[in-house]
Amino acid sequence: ANLVPADIKGVSNVLKALTKGEATGILPDQFPPEISGQTSTFFNVRTRTMTLIHKLIGRVKCNTLIASAIRVVDGWEIYFQRVDDDINSTDISASLNALNRSIEDIVKLNPSQYQWEYKRFKDLKDNGKKFYD
């Protein structure tokens, strides 16, 4: 594995790898900075979603899978699933909604093991209070 930083140089390395037909992995459910995300639906809640994957697919036209590792008594169960076909849409909203639906499908396999500390809803406010207060 070749880990790269989550900055412009890292994105450049990912793009180069994809253009060479190499496999890459991105954690798609991180809460992105405002400049790197757009509002989309995640578990029926409107929240910010990273746009990087949509942009990479638009440039490279690569295949996409979603993966997860679920801890079991004697190790791990690894799952690979197809991503909703709309992830390939040129419409960014359709693509991001497809990404989030695919993440939801993986989370539903075992919600207790999802990394909820990613705080996907931290930009939400309810009656002036932040979602995680």
Roles of regions detected by a PLM:
Residues 8-133:
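Non-catalytic C-terminal accessory region of glycerolipid acyltransferases
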Residues 1-8:
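Membrane-interfacial amphipathic helices and adjacent loop/beta segments
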